[in-house]
């Protein structure tokens, strides 16, 4: 009776409304999909929102371009959820990948010449409809199209004008995608006293309520008393839930929350380094799955907005009580996967405490840096005074050597203080000694074996090429020596196993899911990283693929650093995409080496460096250890409160 329809492709309507045999709810049926629209469900988020939601990112939309109008060919299953208000977030996806960030300007979108026509069409014609479906949705009735005709008459042109007006402003190039979404929501939900009749959305709400009153007062003829009773109960319930449609207070509150969330998302993206933004999107993406009803072909072409579900009153109160930093952290936690139903006043206070502590540490760090700067200036001044005094003396004094020794000691102390900020664990392999502090207990360390196809990359390029050419994997046969040298840079990272086996591994690696291929069940883990080599720095992910041997021990058969842009992080972490590109069959019978016993070939030198938020593997020139050949940095996962 009342519910949300979500379009997939613009076409004639094929979905019909029927009554559910079990609960007498009205059910939309279309192409084999049933959408229960239960009595009392509202067309909005809030008290009784019809939502399809996931922990972090929530899909609800269309193939190719989002058409959240009433012209639909298929329907998508929606889940009744009373936990909060739908708030659209300024991220646009295409398939599994980011198409627009909150900071994206139209000039950035124009770089994708293949997709720009679809993007422009969406912005000019449909973005307002998409937001409408998230925030308001549509009223349906199984016996006639009176509500559709009302929407066409009152709202279709109104929303189209908003889309055209806001898209023109955005396409001038100065606004970000976050500011575009804020404009759309602000104009669509405009209902202040400055607008005649309270604004388009309020006028539409009043018309809907008048139509509901008419249906209650004039039930269809020929009904039995029992049928009439059920009919009146349903429509009175619908009227009760639909009353918010003309609530000026509600729409003003939602518009304010949308503005706060859009601004928070923009600030989050502006304040993050590239690898941190990759981590945020990857962590949220792990908890996002395209709806099962979509085929793989549809999933990869879908263009859609996404939203979070949250108690809008609570979020607004938190913003007023604690300010923008706490609101920004709350939004960040929801992007990382925190569910709106788990966010209450106690959680808000907890987040506020974390933000205060973070600010305190930042202030202490700033104060310490200032003191160090002042100290350095004083030391420099003292050295200069000593030098002047020395030049003023006649001849060489007997104390000169001792002054030089004193300066040398001061320099050594400074270096030791600076070096104390990180824990360095240099390891020389191939029979040489191992340096470092105390050996850690093996408690909590994980067991791994290394497959021969991973160990192969530790050899010389010539030997690698020879073995691949003789092997069974077609993808590697016939590669040139230059290609092998390039691939060795991203595959020869076996030092990562030191981190993978440690008890801290879960702080760095995300579980990217399991799947079966080539007759074995495989598991995949990813971590955000950066590779520095040849004067270049590449951000991306460290991929680890494993299967279990006969004893149940994980065997690492795939290990690689994959350069990854922000726009393609979705494909990198999506199990379906990974499965399709994974090696067809792995020879599980090959002899594997215990990771604890693995050593690099003689002459290779690397060291691992643990810092607060990262783990580094540094490869050095064996002939000159001051020369760094490569550096792989693996970053900690974002903090989830």
Curated annotation (Swiss-Prot):
InterPro entries listed in its UniProt record: DUF3654 (IPR022115), UPF0329 (IPR011667)
Superkingdom: Eukaryota
Composition-biased stretches (Basic and acidic residues): 358-387
Residues covered by region (Disordered): 358-444
Pfam family for this entry, one: DUF1609
TM segment ranges: none
Biased composition (Basic residues): 435-444
Similarity section: Belongs to the UPF0329 family.
Protein name: UPF0329 protein ECU11_0030
